Swiss-Prot record:
This is Putative competence-damage inducible protein. CDD domains: cinA. InterPro entries: CinA, CinA-like_C, CinA_C, CinA_KH, Competence-induced_CinA, MoaB/Mog-like_dom_sf, MoaB/Mog_dom. Signal peptide: none annotated. Belongs to the CinA family. It comes from the Bacteria.
Amino acid sequence: MKAELIAVGTEILTGQIVNTNAQFLSEKMAELGIDVYFQTAVGDNEERLLSVITTASQRSNLVILCGGLGPTKDDLTKQTLAKYLRKDLVYDEQACQKLDDFFAKRKPSSRTPNNERQAQVIEGSIPLPNKTGLAVGGFITVDGISYVVLPGPPSELKPMVNEELVPLLSKQYSTLYSKVLRFFGIGESQLVTVLSDFIENQTDPTIAPYAKTGEVTLRLSTKTENQALADKKLGQLEAQLLSRKTLEGQPLADVFYGYGEDNSLARETFELLVKYDKTITAAESLTAGLFQSTLASFPGASQVFNGGFVTYSMEEKAKMLGLPLEELKSHGVVSAYTAEGMAEQARLLTGADIGVSLTGVAGPDMLEEQPAGTVFIGLATQNKVESIKVLISGRSRLDVRYIATLHAFNMVRKTLLKLENLL
């Protein structure tokens, strides 16, 4: 199965927006075992769009068009594809009802004839409902080639793909079963080196490493008859991979933290906090609230997080956390002393079970003779106060702050796992 992605919109060609849909769709197609061989961007022009559709139809079995489903005259995708397929546009009853419901709450003058275009589908296609917008998508197969039309805004496209298109394609084509392993504390190059024999000799299942900011994932994939067989094959391979050791002799299982494309260290940590009914607080310097903001993004965060501190300057660390100013000056803000003091004081002041702190040099300049990327992370519980030093070198200021936050979540996660092992 060969797929082609066509992004429709002059704003993509002029650089006004970034085509993030292409990456998302490519990942989804890979999960289904569908190869994406071509990606094309075309402006809001019928003649050029017809040309692109014609070319795609000659070299691909699945053509996915994104964008151009709106109410304006330059939204031409459905109209142009219908013209190419020599089919009419018809109204989808469910989409029409959604339009009625939407405009019933607004002034009558706000509904114009152009709005009706959003409820149209190509005759003979399967409508793809839009749960977060008004423009209905569609799926149609003509002469052995399948065509998909999707809205352009990612907030509309992603739910439509996840909830409508993926289940539909899973029924149409053989499914590729996948499992994503997530690692933190090892780089992609070392992980690939450690697993080089598996990767070089792979057949089925396949192994695909992906480097992300601060972490690495491995996608294990297999084509089998059902989920049970896939789970068995992927589980056996996973056990073999995690039994390997890093170049420093550390078990690879120690830097593995979870499963899933949409998982994260923050989510794993949050779920452990909920599981063990523990509360957490933070005092942040260089990350300026990023740890707390990330934690608060999860529904139900109030179960584990009541509040914390952002103490960017030395004076605020003394004033808000009650740390002795002279001691801070003596040790410096980029120090184990300061990190541990911040974590412990934050815990005591809020009554949380766990206190976390982040202090360091985001860059690009040095601070207190410490190079950019030097970070101290403190962690305090009722029984222990500790800190770690990490060096995040060669990274942008934004990346230093983000990766430091990952280290903080990982430190909390490991602490909670130790608690789990004691139960």
